[in-house]
């Protein structure tokens, strides 16, 4: 994922 690659 693309968004899943961004840890929040």
Curated annotation (Swiss-Prot):
Which superkingdom does the taxonomy of this entry point to? Eukaryota
Q: What is this protein called?
A: Unknown protein 12
């Amino acid at each position: 994922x693309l968004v899943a690659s961004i840890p929040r």
